[in-house]
Amino acid sequence: METFQVILLALIQGLTEFLPISSSAHLILPSQILGWADQGLSFDVAVNTGSLFAVVIYFRHEIVVLAKAWFTSLASKQQTQESKLAWWIILATIPAVIVGFTAKDFIETHFRNTLVIAITTIVFGLLLWAADRMSKAQLTEFQMGWKKALLIGLAQAMALIPGTSRSGATMTAALMLGLTRDAAARFSFLMSVPVSFGAALLVTKDLVSSPAPIDYQALGLGIVVSFVAAYLCIHFFLKFISKIGMTPFVLYRLALGAILLGLLYL
């Protein structure tokens, strides 16, 4: 891979992974516009690892507190709001794990194409707009309860369909269930950690058995660029989301979906 290609794709991954705008919709654009070949499994692992490092480091204090509270609850059988949140994150992860293990190949074969990505980008953009407009926005992530956590987890599993956007689907569900914008974003980011880690392990297993050569310099650059882009994206999204709302991202998704349809049929 050329250096420009590595930087551009890693930037796209880092900037779109945690925004509700679909990373898969953006990663398909270079191949459609520039005619680039698929970047390969090893590069996918690299840029996803960079994004995972970003969210873990950004929320390192919260993750440590939640982990300690969770382990303490196992020993003491007493629950705090932090241990409950940790349990809810685990619960919300289960649907995506089940769907990922049982339907990953089917989804990759039947849904990873430009038409599906364009349609889901538009449809789930409209759902995000409706959720943001109708949300009661009263609950924090510590107040939602296990049923709401499970429903958000089901939304995350649905986001395995390309173009849906994991963060977009989970924030949409959280807003519909009454969480504030800040709480919806924080819970979405925190619940991305176990799912991203599991996905990285799953893809790494496939990578080990792949005979394709590995460009370690490109992978290292991809990890660094993806990490920096994702970290800055998380920081500024959380800083401004309560003020700007979801409308800018909805409009962007509609435009992006229209562009993809145009590239497909024009």
UniProtKB/Swiss-Prot annotation:
Q: State whether keyword DNA repair applies.
A: no
User: Which is one GO molecular function term here?
Assistant: undecaprenyl-diphosphatase activity
Biological process, per Gene Ontology:
cell wall organization; peptidoglycan biosynthetic process; regulation of cell shape; response to antibiotic
* Any one Pfam family match given in the protein's UniProt record, by short name: BacA
Give me the disulphide-bonded residues: none
Reaction catalyzed:
di-trans,octa-cis-undecaprenyl diphosphate + H2O = di-trans,octa-cis-undecaprenyl phosphate + phosphate + H(+)
According to the record, the segments passing through the membrane are 1-21, 39-59, 87-107, 111-131, 144-164, 183-203, 218-238, 244-264
Q: Where in the cell is it found?
A: Cell inner membrane
Regarding the membrane, this protein is recorded as: Multi-pass membrane protein
Q: Name one GO cellular component term.
A: plasma membrane
Classification via HAMAP family:
Undec_diphosphatase (MF_01006)
The protein's name is Undecaprenyl-diphosphatase
Query: From what organism does this protein derive?
Result: Shewanella frigidimarina (strain NCIMB 400)
